[in-house]
Amino acid sequence: MEFTGERFVPQCQGEIAAEHYHRYFFASGFVAGKRVLDIASGEGYGTHILAQSAAHVTGVDISPEAVANATQKYAGDRIAFLQGSAATIPLPDAAVDVVVSFETLEHLSEQEDMLGEIRRVLRQDGLLVISTPNKPLYSRQGDNFHVKELCREEFVALLKSRFAHVSLLGQKVMYGSLLSGTGGETLLLRQREEDGAVERMLFTEQARYFIALAGNGPLPPTQSSFFDYPLEKSDLTAQLRENLAELQERHDAAQARLEAVEAAYTAILASRSWLATAPLRRLRHLLKGKGNKS
């Protein structure tokens, strides 16, 4: 599958890759030995990650092309793909232990229907792991595929309308140093460029995405995690490489023009006409010198 901006594909690199892989690696910690549903499974890479430890994973996507691609690439004894909508999931009641739904909610206007369907296919003590962009921060980027983005309060309220317990985490790609504690909310420290002062704020207030665990039974404990994504694959590095390549092209073009001028000049110096007119140029030089003395 090719990247269109609607569904992530594994050949993508940069921040988008770090975000998507981190979410699925995080979710894989809750699916060991479980029956799992991956809503909006897309290319299938995430469903495949979950299937490494789950008893069985069903990926559901509305796109026939995505389902066909994922089936051909990933299907096996513990993984299957079905075509269907998040608002009308093609599974029976209480069919799965865990539902994973990453970056799907904001693509639908029928968000209450989606949560109702997730609740229907989950077992009574089942777990939902779901993510969505943080509207106040993400909307600045613009996304033509998003129908209804949510702020923190709206996201939590929607989940609590269907589930008794909700636990919220934040996600944001950063390059820096991580100090991880054993409890409490993560504190984000940022030094202001204008005066060097240090700003202190809760990480979830600055997160670009929210990831929530929801269920009607006790929720499993969560730990902060850091996905060590190579800096050389970051968006910044890619932009610097692009700028460097452009500068190299300009340098090569300028060098080629200089060499062409030098070659033309050398050709002129070696030409018969240049050699034949050499006495005239010397005479003109002498006459010019005498004129200056007078």
Language-model regions: role of each:
Residues S139-A157:
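Acceptor-substrate binding/catalytic loop of class I
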Residues E103-H107:
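A short His-aromatic
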Residues D125-T132:
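Conserved beta-strand signature within the Rossmann-like core of class I S-adenosyl-L-methionine
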Residues L50, I118, L159:
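Class I S-adenosylmethionine-dependent transferase superfamily signal
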Residues M1-A94, V98-F102, E112-L115, G142, ...:
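Conserved N-terminal segment of class I S-adenosyl-L-methionine
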Residues F163-Y175, E193-E199:
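Conserved S-adenosyl-L-methionine
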Residues E112-Q124:
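A short glycine-rich, Lys/Arg-flanked "PGG" loop and its adjoining helix->strand segment in the class I
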Residues P133-Y138, K172-G176:
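Short "lid" loop at the C-terminus of a central beta-strand within the Rossmann-like core
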